[in-house]
Amino acid sequence: PSVIFKGADNTPYEKIGDEVRSLADEVPFDIPDSWEWVRLGNISSYAETKQKVNATSADPSIWGLDLEDIEKGGRLLEHKTVGERKAVGDKTVFAKGDILYSKLRPYLLKILVAPDDGICTPEIVPFRVYGVIDPNYIVNYLKSPYVDNLINSITYGVKMPRVGTETMTSLLVPVPP
């Protein structure tokens, strides 16, 4: 993990191991002195291996979330069970309170806090933030025009653009006190 701090010159620096480098060109905007910049990978489980389950062996009464159930902007449209959906294939397990982030076509901003436990398509990355950070704050930050523009400038794939794990874990997040 890295540590981000303000130097004597009042600009942000990042220390990784013994190496210190300036973040002056990477920090997108000023934040209040009491706030701090952190990397999403240091405050969340985004990069951790997710628990998988085959939908055919999952409890048919649990929620089975697909991308089409989430409207552009993150509003949940449908809440179908695995049985109702007749879901098949490998799915990712998530828990109530997890942030659900669609890595496929991220410009659609299909990001929300899970209202219940369930399983979802592997195109959705469930993750938790550590400590007392409100997941709704992170969801709103991820939907911000700054993050939206940044992520969409570095997606890969033409027909089905995706955002990579490294892009997300290195994302700078302003955290209030």
Annotate each language-model stretch with its function:
Residues 67, 165-168:
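ATP/adenylate-binding site constellation spanning eukaryotic-like Ser/Thr protein kinases
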Residues 12-21, 41-44, 53-86:
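DNA target-recognition patches
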Residues 21-51, 174-177:
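Non-catalytic DNA-recognition/assembly elements of restriction-modification systems
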Residues 31, 67, 113-114, 129, ...:
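Hydrophobic residues in beta-strands and at strand termini
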Residues 1-27, 31:
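Intrinsic disorder at enzyme termini
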Residues 89-92, 96-147, 152-166:
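A short beta-sheet element
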